[in-house]
């Protein structure tokens, strides 16, 4: 038995998931360039003040969008950790 409304909702979720993946890929292209810039200018991979500002900004955006700000912060922290890991790898590759 099919449920057309459920299928429609799931199609919407699938489309949003695809958009999220594409947006994350674009974000990582930008952070890759940031990592290369930092490595070439001897800057540290992490920038705690920038990260704190980003978290505050994302929490505010989440509240306005009626999304749990704690969830948004956890999501951004996960992304930031991965970005820092990439930046560290870029810096290490530049030193070898």
Where are these regions (language model features)?
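Domain-level signature for soluble enzymes in the chorismate/prephenate branch of the shikimate pathway
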Residues: 1-96
